[in-house]
A protein has these predicted regions:
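Outer membrane beta-barrel
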Residues: 49-214, 223-241, 245, 250, ...
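Small side chains
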Residues: 5, 11-13, 138, 194, ...
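Exposed aromatic-hydrophobic patches
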Residues: 218
């Protein structure tokens, strides 16, 4: 049997009508024999969708295996304490999903993360419709997906410069626990992502969603039923090897549980997130500012608070021939909770924490090895994070230090 014939036999399980035509073509060109083609056909298994309207199905997968070593030391009330450290391997993400296209611009996407708990295993689940007219071009989404708030949050986790998201990003976007805000991340609702055909580089988006993230099928018991309204706008410019994008994201809800999903304090939140991105000659960087005006958000939920944060991140890729690319990466993050409070576990994933602080900062330095781009990537990084002050007194002489080493291997398919 020819080499091409053997390769075709190995892929027989994916045959369909188009593959039959391909086999006939290979026979007519003399690449394989008719007997070889018939043998491949006998061993093939047709995989077809249940509904006839489905035109194609695409498999989506991601596997991330991570090592983490996390050490936290707290200095509070005149004492120093080393908290229980972490030194383990974890399956960080195990995504498996599908995208089905039905024609006429309609599609549906469902992705599950088997590394999460059974209560929050959905990554995405939404229906989409492509729309294109003279003055209206974009895509409508209905379902569970990420809002456009906090650059690092809505950037795919497979494309992060760092292994985990930053102190400030996690504080603004992770689930509301009475300290974190829960503004970004995944919400159930209606989304529109559009562009202006007459103005190249100008994009925008709007969404109306539940105000609580990470709850795809219902809002938490006792939650306020008011919605969250979000919008974004950006302009991108590309000149040869240089591209730059500037934009701003906005979110507002007139009623969410600022005391956490189990709390009883419902109030309004307005959040803004201007940002800038730059790519030039191997350098890739971004920076954003996060700010939220929250009613009844601190001091036993009796006073307003204005948390704010800053992120700056960059990496530079060096080609190393057949071995891919190597990219040193750095990130700085700063957070001021304005008295709402933050624990180390709020900003550093899987860190242990006991004391609540006022503000904090972190520095990350690492190396990314793009063996086959993001499809096959290894990351190694160190992060130092420090929180200081007391929740109700930013000048209090107390702080917490975290030293974190992580390594992660990633495969996309």
């Amino acid at each position: 049997m020819t080499i091409l014939g053997a390769a075709a036999l190995c892929s027989a399980g994916a045959l369909n009508a188009q593959d039959r035509q391909t086999l006939d073509l290979l026979v007519s060109k003399g690449v394989i024999t008719r007997a070889e083609a018939d043998n491949i056909g006998k061993n093939s298994v047709a995989i077809t969708p249940k509904q006839k309207a489905v035109k194609s199905i695409k498999l989506i997968g991601r596997v991330q295996t991570q090592y983490e070593n996390i050490n936290v030391r707290e200095y509070a009330n005149g004492t120093s304490e080393s908290l229980t450290s972490k030194n383990d391997f974890i399956m960080r993400r195990m995504f498996l999903g599908m995208e089905a296209k039905l024609g006429a611009g309609w599609s549906a996407t469902v992705i599950a993360d088997f590394a999460r708990s059974s209560d929050n295993y959905l990554e995405y689940a939404y229906i989409s419709k492509d729309v294109e007219y003279d003055f209206l071009k974009g895509k409508l989404h209905l379902g569970y997906k990420k809002t456009t708030f906090a650059v690092e949050e809505y950037m795919s986790a497979s494309k992060l410069f760092t292994i985990e998201r930053s102190l400030a990003t996690r504080y603004f976007t992770e689930g509301n626990n009475g300290r974190r805000l829960g503004i970004g991340g995944r919400h159930t609702g209606v989304y529109w992502d559009g562009s202006i055909p007459q103005i190249e580089g100008l994009t925008y988006g709007v969404s109306v969603t539940n105000s609580y993230n990470n709850n795809p099928t219902s809002i938490p018991a006792g939650a306020d039923n008011n919605l969250m309204y979000s919008a974004n706008v950006a302009y991108a410019l590309k000149l040869d090897d240089v591209s730059i994008q500037a934009g701003a994201n906005f979110s507002y809800t007139n009623g969410t549980n600022v005391a956490g999903t189990a709390g009883t304090v419902h109030a309004e939140v307005l959040a803004v997130n201007p940002y800038i991105k730059l790519k030039a000659f191997g350098l890739d960087m971004w920076a954003d500012f996060l700010l939220a005006d929250m009613k009844d958000a601190k001091n036993a939920f009796s006073q307003n608070a204005t948390p704010m944060g800053v992120n700056v991140a960059a990496e530079y890729k060096f080609d190393i021939g057949e071995f891919g690319q190597i990219a040193p990466a750095v990130r700085y993050s700063w957070i001021d909770t304005d008295g709402r409070g933050i624990k180390m576990s709020d900003g550093v994933r899987n860190a242990n924490a006991e004391t609540t602080y006022y503000a904090g900062q972190s520095v990350y330095a690492g190396i990314n090895w793009y063996i086959k781009g993001n499809d096959l990537k290894f990351q190694l990084g160190y992060e130092w994070a420090q929180l200081n002050g007391a929740a109700n007194n930013k000048h209090a002489a107390q702080h917490s230090d975290a030293n974190v080493v992580r390594a992660q291997m990633q495969v996309l398919f």
